[in-house]
A protein has these predicted regions:
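Active-site PLP attachment segment
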Residues: 1-3
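Non-catalytic terminal extensions of PLP-dependent enzymes
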Residues: 9-10, 14-20, 25, 38-190
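His/Asp/Glu-enriched, well-ordered alpha-helical/loop segment
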Residues: 34
Length: 190
């Protein structure tokens, strides 16, 4: 039963509904998934996953630092995310944060947020989830180290990545200037 607190629902029409979900509160599907996730974790589970997220971020930060990456804020302990700057690689070989992100895609790794925050040059905002296993984190470290080495030995290869995705690098300038917001099948294109 919906109870008396949902004034916008007619009980006679839908006795078990909480009413219409609309966009005023954001994406209703995302909100519902977040709510279900929090409820499934429960009172004890929420602090535990926060601890795992922090542990994963600090582990990755330490491992990447050991392998030659520059942390934007090395004196800080990571909360659930940390920032790596590849500005030294850009200065040495012209390799950018975008090149690292695109190269990760070839290894089946979702690219981290790049160029945020804007005050850190050539940065990657790395945010491992609380559910990543140590094996997955270690694989990420191995791939990042390989890319760091490749940025020095074969920078042109990294500038061309990704090679294995259905779509390679998009023309960002063209996309910003020509706002095609609808798909037109090739047979109907002018």
């Amino acid at each position: 039963d919906t109870g008396p607190w949902y004034r916008f629902v007619r009980k006679k029409d839908r006795p078990f509904s909480i009413g219409r979900l609309s966009a005023f509160a954001g994406n209703a599907g995302v909100l519902l998934r977040a709510y279900v996730y929090a409820r499934l974790l429960g009172r004890e589970g929420m602090p535990r996953v926060a601890e795992y997220a922090t542990l994963n971020a600090n582990y990755l930060a330490a491992q990447l630092r050991k392998r030659g990456f520059t942390l934007a804020y090395p004196e800080r302990r990571a909360s659930h995310e940390f920032i790596v700057t590849v500005a030294p690689q850009k200065k040495a070989n012209g390799i950018t944060a975008l090149d690292f992100s695109k190269s990760l895609l070839d290894h089946g790794i979702h690219a981290p947020t790049n160029y945020f925050p804007l005050l850190v040059p050539e940065c990657l905002l790395i945010e491992p989830t609380e559910t990543e296993s140590k094996d997955t984190l270690d694989r990420f470290v191995v791939v990042m180290k390989m890319l760091l080495d490749k940025s020095a030995s074969n920078p042109d290869w990294m500038k061309g990545a990704p090679y294995t995705t259905p779509v390679r690098r998009l023309d960002d300038v063209k996309a910003a200037k020509e706002l095609d917001l609808a798909y037109v099948p090739p047979s109907r294109a002018a």
